[in-house]
């Protein structure tokens, strides 16, 4: 090796020159040590030589003292390794414990300062420090630098450790007094070490087996070093990770000696081979090595383009096995030298050395500079270029202009391509990666038992193939499938009878018993730390998956961004640069793409759905704010127009997949979704049609997969509900309406809810004739069902087939149903169920059919009256009609008294009291007896006697159901107006429901 005069140049430049002239083996040693430091796997094993730099008493002098007390004089010549242990043992046996302890106290009761090497050791950020020294110098250095380690020098300290970092004093110390029982010194102490210190011994062995060890402060002939080296080799066995040894002898090591120790598994960094120094200047030699390590840790020795490419490639190439990575996780790969922003820009952070990422992007922009790279480096550069491009890493932030960040997820599962997934599963696997993808697709298709078993096989096969990445991800996915299965079993046991009409068991008892046995005591939190060291080093960014709260950091960040966005909204401020809502959007899609493209199972977990819901809700809330706020001069000057937010395909899918119907309703109450532009409508339609076709397939055939059904049906309901805002082709709309009316399970959407979904679809699409024909087919089917005298339509919202007829008439006033008319013309008096049903659809019938039907039907009860009004058969109330209403109210009053006595105070969905109250208020009914029925229904009372009504009982949501005529009449009523205005003001202030503001502004102000 070439020596450099350290006195000739500035120290930093000298170190760089030393580094550039180092032997390649030493360079690799330095790189590996600094890499271990960055990965939290570095352990320094500190010997007496480091304490000697602080003038702490040396061990051989203590042995000399014992020898002199025994034999009257110091030993002539050097002690052998055995004598270092035997002489203290002889003294203890001959002179006794008290004399032995007395010499210890006299010898070691000193106060010495720490030295620079203690600080330099800690500057390398070791995970643990192990030492055979008795002193407290390293303890003191830790406290000075704010590094907290649990000091363990006795057995009881192990259980009382308060930090995950240990300062392990394997030979004890004198914190509990200068007694031989507190330290390892004499021969018996060494021979009985494992027996006397089992906890410390096991802890040390565990650390040694899983970390990179650097010995410092020892001599190659030291008894401790030979014993410890044998331990390391024994513990690490086949995966023996050769420890490092910092040698600080004055003269360079002989080549034969170097080879000898390398064959024993010790990698030596020889200070004397690096620098010329005074024979007695051990501090300078220690410092030379430690400073090289520290400077290398800060990338100060990277200068050439080849080194830049090699360094980045070494960090990134293990990640080529992943289909996508989250940009924010790259900071872990580069030890926080840079931050990788979600918009694809890179920001220098902790890097104090050469700007290697800056240089990479300079090479990216310069063909001339790239052409100077060697063939190997050019290939590596292209591999890195492709990796960064695929993962959306674009440029340094300082060089970024206007960025158009595109969003693209290439997962079949994300896009709901179920048929393509099934086809892939049936094909022959070429690699273990194919099997891994198949297991994920099986899970997405609800075939969880098959998925679990395939993951189990992959785990075994990946061990044989040494494919750590597939092994780790399969372990995580298998565990999460297991969680999904246990949740499903609980759900089916508790709700299966209500949902499916019977207790449904999608998994056999044998399978459940087996997976319970296999997963008992499996702790996902321990998975990453249990992986081989090399895997942990390469895939640090995957550690967060080995955690039940793997979205925790993003959830916290989302909370911060939510507060920031809402603060901006409340203050009316403008964001410059990348706004908080854009950060939310990009982080959201980074997470989605990472999870889906790497086939990570997470879609059945509440936390994941909640994270998506919160993110999307925030984006829409911000868009509503941007749409409705006034643009001031600043806005015109800098922006010129309001927010350009629009709903893309991916946004639509995320809302469909992760929002419940109530969540969408909440959005609609707080934001004008209809004012948001919906882009990529063809892609959205393809997605919606795919859902419709899947519903049709699932419920056209026997043997429906109930597990798939439970995870798919919520998405289907939300997607078709949210489709209100999408302009569809007539063909696509037809497929959706058919699936909705003929194939959607009654238990999920009864006839009333299906009407709501259908009516919403007309907002952007109206009701083309082809769709009217589909609805007509549906009504014919319903008419045929009513042949059964026991059949009744089930509705949870008071909407029935009659409302479908009204919807048709709204869009096609002259529509006549030929088939319904034919059924009607075939009616006979005994088919009363069909007569009642078709009476409600009277407007859709031909003139002859109407006449024929009315020959069987007259207005005989309140339901006939209400149906007659709905279908337009009754335009004005006759005295006979009012008598029917009064009879109904009298019956209702009697029932009310009985129900009240029984503790029942609710009305059925078919109760007409509030409707009759409204008609009385609008003077469509003038019967004075109406006031006799006050006290049964608050809404009825509000309209019949507004002057004396108790407005504490007024429910604001009533107003949202009233039409323009009724709201106008309320606003003109002197008894109602003031009270209603106060209620509306309170709702505007304390709720996000924009409808209250619209009612207040449009009718009352």
UniProtKB/Swiss-Prot annotation:
Species of provenance: Bacillus subtilis
Annotated stretches, region: MID: 296-548
Reported effect, residue 134 to A: Decreases the NADase activity in presence of the phage tail tube protein
Complexes and interactors: Homotetramer (dimer of dimers). Homodimer. The SIR2 domains are arranged in a central core, adopting a head-to-head arrangement, while the CTDs are positioned at the periphery of the complex. Tetramerization is necessary for the activation of NADase activity. The NADase enzymatic activity of this homotetrameric form is autoinhibited. The activated form of DSR2 (after binding to the phage tube protein) exists as tetramers and dimers, with the tetramers exhibiting more NADase activity. Each tetramer binds 4 NAD(+) molecules.
Result of changing residue 282 to A: 50% loss of NADase activity
Site (Interaction with phage SPR tail tube monomeric protein): 574, 576, 918-919, 922, 962, 966
Residues the record marks as site: Interaction with the phage SPR tail tube monomeric protein: 31-32, 50-52, 204, 206, 495, 497-498
EC number in record: 3.2.2.5
Region called Inter-dimer interaction, residue ranges: 56-111
The protein's name: Defense-associated sirtuin 2
